[in-house]
Amino acid sequence: MLLFVGLGNPTPDSENNRHNIGFKLIDALNQKFGLSKQKPKFKGLLTTGNVEDKKVYAIKPLTFMNNSGICIRELIEYFKIDAEDVIVFHDDLDLEFGKVKAKFAGSSAGHNGIESIDKFIGKDYSRVRIGIGRPKTKADVADHVLKDFDEDEMIQLEKITKNIIDSMAILIDKKLDLFSSTVNNK
């Protein structure tokens, strides 16, 4: 059993923000694999089903980015999911736009959603970092992550999302380096 988590903020005006790339991945996963209708549970929107013959849960926390860990802890305790079986999709400033890097454990690199999850379940889970690039000045970081993708970026994002979803079998097997290189080289 696996838990996929997409990080984002739950307001309608945040839908196309760079910070909401995790939500977009969960939506694509739900659509591609025909997971159940999203239901409000565990302070998030929860779906369930099978991906590559593996039972999965997928959630978009409704607690806002900085409190995502609360939702995740409740869910893994209820379903008795090990932290090692959690895979989190999130934006990453330190990766070039469109690049993907999957890894197990490690630091939050200043990402508040990851810091919250670390606080509530520890660091031993997988992360799929999706590059949104860094703004030119440090002062612009908050504006950058909360800004909508532009039209060209949305087109690229569709391709990136498709590559990630098409490579799910590799991710489910937790071959994280192979997953990253496969997605980045499609």
Curated annotation (Swiss-Prot):
Q: Where does tRNA bind?
A: F64, N66, N112
Q: Where is the active site?
A: H19 (proton acceptor)
Q: Which SUPFAM superfamilies match?
A: Peptidyl-tRNA hydrolase-like
- Source taxon at top rank: Bacteria
Q: What is its EC number?
A: 3.1.1.29
- State any GO CC term: cytoplasm
Q: Where is this site: Discriminates between blocked and unblocked aminoacyl-tRNA?
A: N9
Q: Name one GO molecular function term.
A: peptidyl-tRNA hydrolase activity
Gene3D superfamilies, sorted? Peptidyl-tRNA hydrolase
Record's subcellular location? Cytoplasm
Matching entries from NCBIfam families are given as: pth
Q: How does it assemble?
A: Monomer.
What is the stated purpose of this protein? Answer: Hydrolyzes ribosome-free peptidyl-tRNAs (with 1 or more amino acids incorporated), which drop off the ribosome during protein synthesis, or as a result of ribosome stalling.
Q: What is this protein called?
A: Peptidyl-tRNA hydrolase
